[in-house]
């Protein structure tokens, strides 16, 4: 049984890592080193495949060829735990497109949801919004943080 922290990454985390093959992102490195348990769902994998192969994304990130996207996914997916049939446990009125990430974090009993999306996701950690109060009350075990905070917290937890 894996006792490492469980994590859900939003789409932008994957996009940044796949688009810049010359750098190993700390978030992905933690997965590859087995320091965290990456949680994914078929819905998120499908979205990721779609985003990584969009012409406008490839135009912005020329290094992100279809072959590079395939290699990235083929390397990452065997290291992830796939959760099927994730129920809709929480409604995200600000952006329903982000609901699969929140609901996966809930279903996977993740410790972290890592995102750059302050407007639609990290606000759920704030007590000055009704959504934040509801989320924190119902799911206190999930921390929604940005990548630098996540990497720092995991690295600190690994210190002797």
Question: Where are the language model's segments positioned?
Answer:
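Short, well-structured N-terminal submotif of metal-dependent ribonuclease cores
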Residues: 1-40
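Short, flexible loop segments at the rims of nucleotide/cofactor-binding pockets, characterized by
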Residues: 14-17, 62, 88-94
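Short, glycine/charged-enriched secondary-structure capping and boundary segments
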Residues: 21-24, 29, 53-54, 127-130, ...
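Hydrophobic/aromatic ligand-binding patch that stacks against planar heteroaromatic rings
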Residues: 30, 104, 136
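PIN-domain endoribonuclease scaffold, especially VapC-family toxins
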Residues: 32-35, 39-87
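Acidic, PIN/NYN-like endoribonuclease modules and their adjacent C-terminal/linker elements
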Residues: 99, 108, 112, 119-160
């Amino acid at each position: 049984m894996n006792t490492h922290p469980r994590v859900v990454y939003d789409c932008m985390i994957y996009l940044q890592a796949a688009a810049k093959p010359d750098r190993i992102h700390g978030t992905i490195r933690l997965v590859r080193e087995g320091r965290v348990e990456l949680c994914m769902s078929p819905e998120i994998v499908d979205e990721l495949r779609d985003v990584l192969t969009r012409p406008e994304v490839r135009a912005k990130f020329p290094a992100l060829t279809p072959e590079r996207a395939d290699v990235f996914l083929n390397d990452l997916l065997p290291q992830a735990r796939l959760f099927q049939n994730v129920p809709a446990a929480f409604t995200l009125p600000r952006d329903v497109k982000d609901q699969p990430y929140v609901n996966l974090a809930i279903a996977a009993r993740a410790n972290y949801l890592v995102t750059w999306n302050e407007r639609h996701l990290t606000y759920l950690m704030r007590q000055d919004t009704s959504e934040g109060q509801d989320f924190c009350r119902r799911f206190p075990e999930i921390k929604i943080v940005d990548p630098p905070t996540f990497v720092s917290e995991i690295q600190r937890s690994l210190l002797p």
